[in-house]
Amino acid sequence: MYIHTTNTNQINMKNLFYLVVIFFISCGPQQNKNQEELPGRLGNENLALKNDKRLNPQLLSALSEFGLDSIAPPPPVSVLSSVEDRLQFIAAAEPLYRGLFASIYQSIDLPNNVINETRIIKDEDGNEIKLYISRPKNISGKLPSVLHIHGGGMAILTANDPNYIHWRQSLAAKNLIVVGVEFRNIGGVLGNNPFPAGLNDCINALKWIHQNKEELGISKIIVSGESGGGNLTIATALK
C-alpha cells in the first residue's frame, strides 16, 4: 500500500509539472501578443501623438501648429511640491490654455438658432454661482437638459471660455437646454478655493435646475463633463 501511494504521488506530481509547463508555454506568447496589441500608450508608453495611427489627420494637423503632437516634458511640480509652487504653476499655465482655445475658436462660428442668458444663484452660505443657459430658438414644449461641468482639472479655465461656450451652444442647437456652471476652481483666475467648494457649486447648480424644471421647460436632466469636469460629474452624482 505504501509503495502504491508513493507511485501515485509521483505520477500526480509529474502530471502537475507537465501542466504547469504547458500553461506557461501556451500563455507566454499570447501575453506578449496582447501586450503588443494594446492601443496607444497602453502598449507603448513612449508613443508620441504624431505617431498614433488612430488619430484623425486633420486633428493632428491642428495640434501640430501648437506643438502638441509630441510627448510633453514633465511638469515642474508634483504632488510633493508646496501648495504655493503648485498655485504658481497653475497661474502660469492657465493663460496658455486659454490663449490656445481662443486661437482655435476665433474662426469657428457659433450656432445662430440659440438663445443665451446668464443667471446668478446663491447657495446657503451666500456664495454666488453664475449659470450660463443656452436653449434653442422657436422650440415649444419641454426639452431634455444638460448640466455641463467644464474641464481644467478643477483648477483652471472657466465656463465662459470660447471652447465651452461653443460646446454648450452646439448642444443647444440640437434641441437641448444646456446650463454651464461657473464653479470655483482651486486656483487660476477664479481664485484659490479648496475642495469641496467647486463640487458644492455643481451640486447647487443641479439642485437649482431640478427645482426650476417647470419654469425652464425641462423634461429630464443629464449631468455631463470632461476631464476634471468628468470627475466633478461623477462626484455630483454620488453626493
PLM features: residue spans?
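Short glycine-enriched nucleophile-adjacent loop
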Residues: 230-239
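Catalytic nucleophile-loop/oxyanion-hole region of alpha/beta-hydrolase
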Residues: 159, 163-170, 179-220
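Short beta-strand element of the alpha/beta-hydrolase
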Residues: 142-152
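N-terminal targeting or regulatory segments adjacent to alpha/beta-hydrolase or S9 domains
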Residues: 27-109
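N-terminal cap/lid segment of alpha/beta-hydrolase-fold proteins
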Residues: 93-141
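Bacterial Sec-dependent N-terminal signal peptides
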Residues: 1-40
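A fold-wide structural signal in alpha/beta-hydrolase
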Residues: 145, 175-182
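Conserved alpha/beta-hydrolase "nucleophile elbow" surrounding the catalytic nucleophile
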Residues: 221, 225-230
